[in-house]
Regions:
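A positional/architectural concept
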Residues: 30-32
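Aromatic sugar-binding interfaces of carbohydrate-active proteins
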Residues: 54
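Proline/serine-rich, acidic intrinsically disordered regulatory regions in eukaryotic membrane-signaling
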Residues: 62-64
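His/acidic/aromatic-lined binding-pocket segments of jelly-roll/cupin-type domains
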Residues: 73-76
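Extracellular/lumenal glycan-associated surfaces
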Residues: 78-80
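Acidic, Ser/Thr- and proline-rich intrinsically disordered linker/docking segments
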Residues: 2-25, 36-48, 57, 66-71, ...
Length: 154
Protein backbone atom coordinates (compact mmCIF):
# COMPACT_ATOMS: atom_id res chain seq x y z
CA UNK A 1 0.00 0.00 0.00
CA UNK A 2 1.44 3.35 -1.06
CA UNK A 3 1.47 6.47 1.09
CA UNK A 4 0.97 4.64 4.40
CA UNK A 5 2.97 7.20 6.38
CA UNK A 6 1.19 10.13 4.74
CA UNK A 7 -2.21 8.52 5.42
CA UNK A 8 -1.18 7.85 9.02
CA UNK A 9 -0.19 11.49 9.53
CA UNK A 10 -3.39 12.80 7.92
CA UNK A 11 -5.48 10.41 10.04
CA UNK A 12 -3.78 11.55 13.26
CA UNK A 13 -4.40 15.17 12.26
CA UNK A 14 -7.98 14.35 11.19
CA UNK A 15 -7.17 16.11 7.93
CA UNK A 16 -9.85 14.47 5.79
CA UNK A 17 -9.53 17.10 3.04
CA UNK A 18 -5.82 16.24 2.82
CA UNK A 19 -6.70 12.55 2.52
CA UNK A 20 -9.02 13.25 -0.42
CA UNK A 21 -6.27 15.35 -2.02
CA UNK A 22 -3.67 12.61 -1.48
CA UNK A 23 -5.92 10.24 -3.45
CA UNK A 24 -6.31 12.78 -6.27
CA UNK A 25 -9.93 13.52 -5.34
CA UNK A 26 -11.92 16.59 -4.41
CA UNK A 27 -13.40 16.51 -0.92
CA UNK A 28 -17.02 15.37 -0.86
CA UNK A 29 -18.57 16.56 2.39
CA UNK A 30 -22.09 17.18 1.07
CA UNK A 31 -24.46 15.81 3.69
CA UNK A 32 -21.62 14.29 5.73
CA UNK A 33 -19.97 17.23 7.53
CA UNK A 34 -21.13 15.97 10.94
CA UNK A 35 -19.91 12.44 10.19
CA UNK A 36 -16.50 13.79 9.16
CA UNK A 37 -16.30 15.85 12.35
CA UNK A 38 -16.67 12.73 14.56
CA UNK A 39 -14.93 10.12 12.39
CA UNK A 40 -11.71 10.27 14.40
CA UNK A 41 -13.62 9.40 17.58
CA UNK A 42 -14.62 6.04 16.08
CA UNK A 43 -11.15 4.94 15.02
CA UNK A 44 -9.09 2.50 17.04
CA UNK A 45 -5.63 3.42 18.25
CA UNK A 46 -3.15 3.29 15.33
CA UNK A 47 -5.95 2.69 12.80
CA UNK A 48 -5.15 4.47 9.53
CA UNK A 49 -7.73 5.84 7.09
CA UNK A 50 -6.74 5.38 3.44
CA UNK A 51 -9.76 6.84 1.67
CA UNK A 52 -13.29 8.05 2.28
CA UNK A 53 -16.48 7.99 0.26
CA UNK A 54 -19.94 9.36 0.91
CA UNK A 55 -23.03 7.71 -0.43
CA UNK A 56 -26.45 6.31 0.29
CA UNK A 57 -26.79 3.12 2.32
CA UNK A 58 -30.22 1.65 3.02
CA UNK A 59 -31.48 1.42 6.58
CA UNK A 60 -30.40 -1.71 8.38
CA UNK A 61 -31.63 -3.58 11.43
CA UNK A 62 -29.07 -1.73 13.56
CA UNK A 63 -30.13 1.75 12.43
CA UNK A 64 -31.91 3.83 15.08
CA UNK A 65 -33.17 6.70 12.97
CA UNK A 66 -36.89 7.29 12.59
CA UNK A 67 -36.51 7.87 8.86
CA UNK A 68 -37.13 5.34 6.14
CA UNK A 69 -35.13 4.40 3.09
CA UNK A 70 -31.53 5.21 2.30
CA UNK A 71 -29.41 7.62 4.32
CA UNK A 72 -26.24 9.49 3.42
CA UNK A 73 -23.26 7.86 5.17
CA UNK A 74 -19.54 8.49 5.20
CA UNK A 75 -17.57 5.29 4.65
CA UNK A 76 -13.91 5.01 5.61
CA UNK A 77 -11.50 2.39 4.32
CA UNK A 78 -9.03 1.84 7.14
CA UNK A 79 -6.10 -0.42 7.85
CA UNK A 80 -8.46 -2.73 9.78
CA UNK A 81 -11.97 -2.40 8.36
CA UNK A 82 -14.57 -0.59 6.36
CA UNK A 83 -16.30 1.78 8.78
CA UNK A 84 -19.63 3.43 7.93
CA UNK A 85 -20.99 6.38 9.94
CA UNK A 86 -24.39 8.09 9.81
CA UNK A 87 -25.07 11.06 12.09
CA UNK A 88 -28.84 11.03 12.64
CA UNK A 89 -30.55 14.39 12.44
CA UNK A 90 -33.31 14.03 15.02
CA UNK A 91 -31.51 12.37 17.89
CA UNK A 92 -27.90 13.45 17.24
CA UNK A 93 -26.87 9.83 17.67
CA UNK A 94 -24.47 8.08 15.35
CA UNK A 95 -25.17 4.82 13.58
CA UNK A 96 -22.10 2.77 12.75
CA UNK A 97 -21.50 -0.34 10.74
CA UNK A 98 -18.10 -1.97 10.63
CA UNK A 99 -16.76 -4.77 8.45
CA UNK A 100 -13.34 -6.25 9.22
CA UNK A 101 -11.16 -6.62 6.14
CA UNK A 102 -10.83 -10.37 6.72
CA UNK A 103 -14.64 -10.70 6.40
CA UNK A 104 -14.73 -9.08 2.98
CA UNK A 105 -14.66 -11.20 -0.17
CA UNK A 106 -14.40 -8.36 -2.67
CA UNK A 107 -15.22 -4.73 -3.34
CA UNK A 108 -16.42 -3.57 -6.74
CA UNK A 109 -17.26 -0.21 -8.24
CA UNK A 110 -19.66 0.53 -11.05
CA UNK A 111 -20.46 3.77 -12.77
CA UNK A 112 -23.79 5.09 -13.97
CA UNK A 113 -24.59 8.24 -15.91
CA UNK A 114 -24.05 10.59 -12.99
CA UNK A 115 -22.94 8.61 -9.96
CA UNK A 116 -20.96 5.57 -8.95
CA UNK A 117 -21.84 2.62 -6.76
CA UNK A 118 -19.69 0.46 -4.49
CA UNK A 119 -20.66 -3.11 -3.67
CA UNK A 120 -18.96 -4.82 -0.73
CA UNK A 121 -19.33 -8.61 -0.72
CA UNK A 122 -19.13 -9.91 2.85
CA UNK A 123 -20.00 -13.48 1.94
CA UNK A 124 -23.31 -13.56 3.80
CA UNK A 125 -24.62 -10.55 1.90
CA UNK A 126 -23.84 -7.37 0.04
CA UNK A 127 -23.42 -3.83 1.32
CA UNK A 128 -24.26 -1.29 -1.38
CA UNK A 129 -23.06 2.30 -1.18
CA UNK A 130 -24.95 4.15 -3.90
CA UNK A 131 -24.83 7.67 -5.35
CA UNK A 132 -21.09 8.10 -4.79
CA UNK A 133 -19.01 10.40 -6.92
CA UNK A 134 -17.65 8.22 -9.72
CA UNK A 135 -13.92 8.83 -9.14
CA UNK A 136 -14.37 8.26 -5.40
CA UNK A 137 -16.04 4.87 -5.98
CA UNK A 138 -13.21 3.75 -8.28
CA UNK A 139 -10.43 4.76 -5.85
CA UNK A 140 -12.24 3.22 -2.87
CA UNK A 141 -12.69 -0.16 -4.61
CA UNK A 142 -9.10 -0.25 -5.91
CA UNK A 143 -7.59 0.54 -2.50
CA UNK A 144 -9.95 -1.84 -0.68
CA UNK A 145 -8.99 -4.74 -2.94
CA UNK A 146 -5.29 -3.93 -2.49
CA UNK A 147 -5.71 -4.01 1.30
CA UNK A 148 -7.70 -7.25 1.20
CA UNK A 149 -4.96 -8.90 -0.90
CA UNK A 150 -2.27 -7.63 1.47
CA UNK A 151 -4.14 -8.98 4.52
CA UNK A 152 -4.49 -12.39 2.83
CA UNK A 153 -0.75 -12.51 2.07
CA UNK A 154 0.27 -11.56 5.63
Amino acid sequence: MNNIEKCKKLTQERDWAGLFELNGLEIDSFGTKKELSVLGDYLQKDEVVFTLVSGMISQSETSTDFGFGAKNWITALTSERILCLDYTMLSSSINTQSFRLNQIQSVSASQGWFFGKITVDIGAGLIVIDNCEKPHAKVFAELANQLIRQKEED
